[in-house]
Design a protein with these regions (language model features):
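Conserved cytosolic headpiece of P-type ATPases
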Residues: 1-173
Length: 173
């Protein structure tokens, strides 16, 4: 599977247009969400790094690798003891996957990945291009769902996923 389009920081890319994730302030969160909500891994075959696992997850990891994101370090951290607080795998009835990760500062970050119609309702904010959380109104949610996601992506039969996160202090957790 290949990533055909991406919507990040209010910008949409299509086809061969490639957003430079290294220059986007939200790229680390995107990469972490993809890696921590994935069981895919990277192997070396004939001197080349190759992503292995679920085809959707492999497509997303290949996109990150093509965007020069250091996925191996994230995958390594994913495998360390104590990183995960809990994980609920994706299934067809829930239409989402949830992973709670203990951060190095002691806080917990919960990542969601799944069908946009199941994730968007859980969101209260979005990140702007500078990485700042700004409120996400019901009107903006509808616009994202009906214009950005449905018209641009789902109407082209793209498998469409949304990622989100929420941070908790240790006391809140």
């Amino acid at each position: 599977m290949t990533v055909m389009a991406l919507y990040i920081s209010g910008q949409s890319t299509h086809g061969s247009q490639n957003v430079s994730l290294n220059s986007d302030k939200n790229s680390t969160l995107l990469a972490e969400s993809v890696i921590y909500n994935s069981s895919a891994h990277v192997e070396v075959e004939n001197g080349q790094k190759v992503a292995k696992g679920n085809v959707t997850e492999v497509g997303m990891i290949k996109y990150l690798m093509d965007s020069k994101v250091e996925v191996e370090s994230l995958i390594h951290r994913r495998g360390q003891d104590g990183t995960f607080e809990f994980q609920i795998p994706f299934n067809s009835s829930r239409k989402r996957q949830t992973s709670a990760v203990r951060l190095t500062n002691g806080n917990v970050r919960v990542f969601l990945k799944g069908g946009p119609d199941f994730i968007i309702d859980k969101c209260s904010h979005t990140l702007d291009a500078q990485g700042k959380a700004v409120p996400l109104s019901e009107e903006q949610k509808l616009d994202l769902m009906n214009v950005t996601v449905v018209k641009q992506y789902a109407s082209k039969c793209y498998r469409t996923l949304l990622v989100a996160y929420c941070d908790y202090t240790d006391a809140q957790w």
